[in-house]
């Protein structure tokens, strides 16, 4: 995962998975969330957080034993609705003017298709990775709770 210090008390790592995988080079991939949860139904009250990082699976296709599937997970056949609900839940648990950092790799699905799933407009973003396929996108929840047009 991308946390500098996963033991930092200000960080809460949530994932639907709780598993361990042996990779082909002998390394172990541990997915051990602080809270095992589904991003479509986040088990926290409205306004609980000032900052949320939303890093959902971005793959629709991956081999059953591939390390990409093990590391990043895979989207369901209902991925548009899943991500729509995920965005909604992230904004629900954010406080007023809370920040949402969204990470997406568009190797299989374009970021424009994903951004169409939320009424909230991003403030800014950054492309990274070897082919600039990974997008880091920043949103801020509006104070009045209104949704952008």
Place the predicted regions along the sequence by residue.
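Class I S-adenosyl-L-methionine-dependent methyltransferase catalytic core
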Residues: 1-149
């Amino acid at each position: 995962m991308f946390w500098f210090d996963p033991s930092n008390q200000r960080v809460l790592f949530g994932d639907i998975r709780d598993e361990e995988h042996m990779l082909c080079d002998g390394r172990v991939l541990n997915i051990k969330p602080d809270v095992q949860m589904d991003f479509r139904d986040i088990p926290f009250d409205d306004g609980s957080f000032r900052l949320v990082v939303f890093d959902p699976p971005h793959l629709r296709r991956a081999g059953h034993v591939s390390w990409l599937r093990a590391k990043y997970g895979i989207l369901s056949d209902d991925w548009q609705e899943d991500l729509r609900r995920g965005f909604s839940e992230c904004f629900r648990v954010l406080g007023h003017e809370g920040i949402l950092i969204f990470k997406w790799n568009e190797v299989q699905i374009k970021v424009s298709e994903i951004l169409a799933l939320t009424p909230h407009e991003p403030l800014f973003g950054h492309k990274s990775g070897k082919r600039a396929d990974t997008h880091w996108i920043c949103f801020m929840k509006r104070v009045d709770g209104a949704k952008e047009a």
